[in-house]
Amino acid sequence: MADVFPLILGIIILLASVISIKTGISVTVVEIAVGVIIGNLGLFHSESWMIYIASFGGILLTFLAGVEIDVDLMKDNFKESFTIGFLSFLIPFVIVFLVTYYIIGWELNPALLTSTALSETSIAVVYSVLTQKGLFKYKIGKLIMVATFITDICTAIALSVLFTKFDIYTLLFYVVSLAVLVMAYYKSDLFFENPLFKNKIGELEIKYVFVLLLGFIFFGSLGGGQAILPAFILGVILSDHFKKHTKGEVKARFKTVAFAIITPIFFIIGGMKVSIPLIYSCFGIFLTLFVLRQLSKYIGVYYPSKIFLKQNYNYVTMMMSTGLTFGLVAAVFGLNNALINQTEYSVITGILVLSAILPTFVAEKYYTPVHSEDLGD
């Protein structure tokens, strides 16, 4: 019998885009919500190839987010970005850990894993929303992206330091990642500037980057590392090539490939992983941790944003309060390594998905900067 699930997936992706356009809600939010619904109603079952594409989609989004980083802006606004990004990580991490370990009574590893997963800000959600709203051309969008980068670097470091079991393969992952990043910095012109390869129908520039990202994923899984951090740094390294040498043409083609099919699978599969029955069985814990996470994110982002920014601090706070990408990576890592159980995994994932939907909806509905004087230069 022919496999009907790829066709169903294609229809779901198309319908999510139609709903997004009709309602004005971010397609990212719609895709996650659809994933939650179809997953819990048993209307769709993910296959192994979909799960792999979903994981690759998260890495690809992370790379594209890195491409959008303005290095000059990061240097010029490092104090603001670092303060907002670091507090966005630190305060949720500390508060969630104290509550899960000392009040709820979870064991040390689940408490640490949960606090790590819930401290992140979703690069994928932030990047998708800022791209769809066209905010990357303005200072506010770039500032949010840099602050998100700082937050997730802290999360990645925490996950690596607290849980990674270092062995020869872990060392290999870091050595290979460093070598690839150095090579990409010095040798990428061979693909981006060579007339033999540049702007050809074969899209060698895109395939070149895909190979590097797949390499990060392979060596990361081999050595227990996380491909998100080197993927993001690769994007930052190649951002200059995309901006100066290709005049944005390759980046535009990258976005077409990513947003047409790959990233929708990431968001839909992410939503499908939420088990509503398991969340319902410990709804009090779920609600408590969700509220604590959002409040601690608010405290960590709103007040420094209000100090550094004359306006739009509500929008910055809402966008920095989103969660999903690296939190899902941390949750899957914890489940696969028996650091958390299925119920704890569902609670973490449910909180991440809800935090991807609600703050994004509020930000877009009430706080999106619309006037040129609101956006900055």
Where do the protein language model's features map onto the residues?
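Structural signature of hydrophobic alpha-helical transmembrane segments
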Residues: 1-8, 48-63, 107-122, 170-182, ...
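Transmembrane alpha-helices that form the ion-translocation and gating core
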Residues: 82-133, 281-370
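Membrane-interface helix-loop-helix junctions at boundaries between adjacent transmembrane segments
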Residues: 101-115, 125-170
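Core mid-bundle transmembrane helix pairs that form the ion/substrate translocation pathway
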Residues: 2, 6-18, 149-246
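C-terminal ends of transmembrane helices
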Residues: 11-25, 62-76, 124-135, 184-197, ...
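Membrane-interface alpha-helices at helix entry/exit sites of multi-pass transporters
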Residues: 136-150, 171, 248-250, 312-317, ...
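Hydrophobic alpha-helical transmembrane segments in multi-pass integral membrane proteins
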Residues: 94-100, 152-163, 213-226, 265-279, ...
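Membrane-interface junctions of multi-pass transporters
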Residues: 19-23, 36-80, 195-205, 211-288
